[in-house]
Each structure stands twice: as structure tokens, then as C-alpha cells.
């Protein structure tokens, strides 16, 4: 199919009248949608210069069926009386142009929704760990975004190791980077909780300032070790390319896999929190810390493990983010605010709320950006979230229980 598509694209520019019958046969026989659209456009290009209005009319109708962006350009030129003298052909061109615009609009909307879901999956991975730590400890961890960044740099280091010591298996380095990034960021998160945060419980302003300072230290450490410039993390072949859904819509493989990976992490997190003893203890401490301690739950150890879990999930998000964006020292700063918005909007400590809020914010951002711009879109979304929180402070999904600290 790739070879046929390349040949069809070449024919769009270099097809000759002698190839007209062959093109008509190929258009009738072709089953692949992308190749069929390209061949149809090549055929229409030949027919549009025919002296017969009937042939040109058939070409105009064929262009309307393709839904290709190039067809839109060709049809717009035909609306000029100086280009097309036959009024019947011009009228058909108007109809076909409206048909093409409608198909292109559908492709753009689907593309925006898909981009929003893709962005939402990254926000979900970033906010999932934050929902656990913020819900359990009530700690505003401003260094959480740097866990994303550390996960991305762990992926970069794993890639370098594969390039040096196992170049034949370089295609599998992201699979190895996942546990490495989780382990590294989880250990850093647990160390952070044991050395700094556990001394600041109940003092939110001091915790915020301390974690913000730690985030700056981590950023400077990465700049010293790896440099201030972005590093290159290459996609393996199985994460390159995409699926051609419509002429103006390609769904990249890396984003499709990241969406599936984010949902997989959500399922694993739900199972961990609802089907294991650790999860039971985490939920108990979240709902009533003092009562859980009276029942023998080691709250200090649970705090440390939950913080490590949340940081590890953020590290997994960094692995995913390294496959679709630039990896640099300031990577985490771009996602920390949106992560907090997801947690607050979804409801503290609620997985279902985090999933709903992450995908909702992602789709809203991508739909509003082309309409009013990225900055105004962010402002509008923030204003709507503030209004929503005023009416429903507990978020979309609230913890249910008789006593909540």
C-alpha cells in the first residue's frame, strides 16, 4: 500500500493523458482508501483539462468524493469564470467544494478530539500520582512536575545505554525505561518524603515553598549533569508513523499507544488501591488518619510508600512524554499547574474524577486553541474551573463517608 500510495502521489504531478484509461481502471479497482483518494485526485487533474464539459463535470464530482485538502484548492480555482467557462461545471464545483469542506471539518474535529485525548492521557499520568499524594497527605508538592522530567531523562539514559551496549535491541528501550523510570522517581519521592515533607505536615505554606525549592534544585541538577539544552529521545520504529483515517487525519502510533498505556496504568492503580492491603491502608489513612493509626495502620510508612507510588507514576508519565515531546530541564514546569487543576476538578483522591477531569481538560484545550488561541483558551478554562469549584468545592467526585479529616 505504501508503494502504491507513493506512485499515486507522483501521478498527481506527472500523469499524462495517455494514462487516463489506466488511471480509471486503477481507481475502480483500488480498495485502500488513502491510495484510492490519491488516484482519484490524479485522475481528476487529467480530466479537468479535457475539452468536454461532461468529462470536466465528472472530474469535479470525483473531487467532491475524495475529501482531500488538495481537492479543495483545485475546486476553489474552478469557481472563477476565467478558469471554468461552463456554468454547469462551476455549479457542480460549488457543490463539491461544500462536500469537501464538510469532510475536512469532520477530520479536523476528530483530530482535535484525538489530540485532546492524547493530551489528557499525559495529564492523567501526571495527575494520578498527585491525586494520591495530595489526597493522602494534603501536601501541595510543587516538585511533582520534576518527577515527570526525571522519568523522561531516565528514558534518555536508558536509550544511551542501549545505543552503547545493545544497539541491536534499541527498539525495545522504552519497555526497559518504564521500570527504570518508575524505580528512580519512586526512590526520589520516598527520600523526599522521609527527609523533608514528613517534618512539614500540617504546614501547607512551608511545604509548598520547600517543594518549590526542591523543584528548582532538581532542575539545576539536570542542567549541570545533562546541559541546559533539550536532549534527543528517538522513537523506535514501532512508535513511528500512524494510521491514515481520513485524507487530512493521521493518528500517530505513539499517541495511540500512550493513550492505551495511560488507561492501563489507571487500571493497575485502581487494582492496587482497591484489591491490596496497601491500597486498603492508603484509603483508610486518606479518610481518617487518626482512626487508621488507632487501628494499627503504620501511617508513617504508608505516607512514604504512597509518596513513592505517586512519584513513580509521574515517572511513567515522563517516559510517555519523552516519545511525543521535547525533553529538557524545564519539562515538568509545563504540566504542574494543569496537574493540580485535574486533581482539584476531579476530586481529591478520586481516580474516576482524575480520569474524567484529565480527558475533559485535554479535549477542551485542543478544541479552544484553534478558536481563540492557546492563552485565551487557558484563561477561559481556568475561569470556568474556578466558577465550578465555587459551586462544588469537593470536585466532580467527592469522598463518601461519615467522617473525613
Where are these regions (language model features)?
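Transmembrane alpha-helical segments in multi-pass inner-membrane proteins
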Residues: 174-179, 304-319, 323-385
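Cytosolic-side transmembrane-helix boundaries in multi-pass membrane proteins
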Residues: 200, 206, 210, 225, ...
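Helix-loop-helix "hairpin" substructures at the membrane interface of multi-pass membrane proteins
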Residues: 250-327, 356
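Membrane-embedded helix boundary and interhelical linker motif in transport proteins
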Residues: 144-191, 371
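Pore- or pathway-lining transmembrane helices of multi-pass membrane proteins that form conduits
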Residues: 146-150, 200-223, 262, 331-344, ...
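Soluble extramembrane regions of membrane proteins in the secretory/endomembrane system
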Residues: 1-101
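Single transmembrane alpha-helix segments in multi-pass membrane proteins
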Residues: 113-157, 191, 195-206, 283, ...
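Alpha-helical transmembrane segments within multi-pass membrane transporters and channels
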Residues: 168-215, 221, 356-361, 392-393
